[in-house]
């Protein structure tokens, strides 16, 4: 997924900073996904997020350093109006539903409509069917979910925070897509104004950032 020509070489020494927001109903496992990804932790007890929590993750993808700011939002209906505060300027959105709960899947469709209305096609969307460890209790068909994701220009993923399945793939693929989107924007704007174009999406591109400065955050990965 690297950019063609000189774009890939130009981006090789850069650090990308991306904002990712998780959206979905309460009890679908958003917090469990983030904690499993960032800290490799899982709690069988339901974790209720009040308004939002914030975690960070550092990665190296094909020689490109990526700083992720991951916003985990509350799923309760009373917090829905706060959504725009958290997804504003996001580069990626992970829309989570519980495969055993048809209603949670239908609510994802509402989030997709809202995100497309507010942010257009510039945001990378991931639709995630979580709790695949409860396959026998599934109420959302795989074909229906994947077909819907394709129809709205999103990628679909199957995950289990409990069994640690599909989560690394989800975040890695999203990061690659966000890098590709940022590089396309850079090339479209030309060398002289690439930063301005990327800034519209909230992307921060730091040239030749020393590794020693890549500290901090709740979690990190090589």
From Swiss-Prot:
GO terms for cellular component: axon cytoplasm; cleavage furrow; cytoplasmic side of early endosome membrane; cytoplasmic side of plasma membrane; endoplasmic reticulum membrane; Golgi cisterna membrane; Golgi membrane; neuron projection. Mg(2+) binds at residues 31, 49, 72. It is a lipid-anchor. Regulated by guanine nucleotide exchange factors (GEFs) including ANKRD27 and RABGEF1, which promote the exchange of bound GDP for free GTP. Regulated by GTPase activating proteins (GAPs) which increase the GTP hydrolysis activity. Inhibited by GDP dissociation inhibitors (GDIs). GO terms for molecular function: GDP binding; GTP binding; GTPase activity. It holds the Pfam family Ras. Interacts with the cytoplasmic tail of integrins ITGA1, ITGA2, ITGA5, ITGA6, ITGA11 and ITGB1; this interaction is dependent upon its GDP/GTP cycle. Interacts with RABGEF1 (via VPS9 domain). Interacts with ANKRD27. Interacts with VAMP7. Interacts (in GTP-bound form) with VAMP8 in response to starvation; the interaction probably regulates VAMP8 endolysosomal trafficking. Interacts (active GTP-bound form) with TMED10; the interaction is indirect and regulates TMED10 abundance and localization at the Golgi. This is Ras-related protein Rab-21. It comes from Mus musculus. The lineage of its organism: Eukaryota, Metazoa, Chordata, Craniata, Vertebrata.
């Amino acid at each position: 997924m690297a950019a063609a020509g000189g774009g890939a070489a130009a981006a090789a020494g850069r650090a990308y900073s991306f904002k990712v927001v998780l959206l979905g109903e309460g009890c679908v496992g958003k917090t469990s996904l983030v904690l499993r990804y960032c800290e490799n932790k899982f709690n069988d007890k339901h974790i209720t997020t009040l308004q939002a929590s914030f975690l960070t993750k550092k990665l190296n993808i094909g020689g490109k350093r990526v700083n992720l700011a991951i916003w985990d939002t509350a799923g309760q209906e009373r917090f829905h109006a706060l959504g725009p505060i958290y997804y504003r300027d996001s580069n990626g959105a992970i829309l989570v539903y519980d495969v055993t709960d048809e209603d949670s899947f239908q609510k994802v469709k509402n989030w997709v409509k809202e995100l497309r209305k507010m942010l257009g096609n510039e945001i990378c969307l991931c639709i995630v069917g979580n709790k695949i460890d409860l396959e026998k209790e599934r109420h959302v068909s795989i074909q229906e979910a994947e077909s819907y994701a394709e129809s709205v220009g999103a990628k679909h993923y199957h995950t289990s925070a409990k069994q640690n399945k599909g989560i690394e793939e989800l975040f890695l693929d999203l990061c690659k897509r966000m890098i590709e989107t940022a590089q396309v924007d850079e090339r479209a704007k030309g060398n002289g104004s690439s930063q301005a174009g990327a800034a519209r999406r909230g992307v921060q591109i730091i040239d030749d950032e020393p590794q020693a400065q890549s500290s901090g955050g709740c979690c990190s990965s090589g």
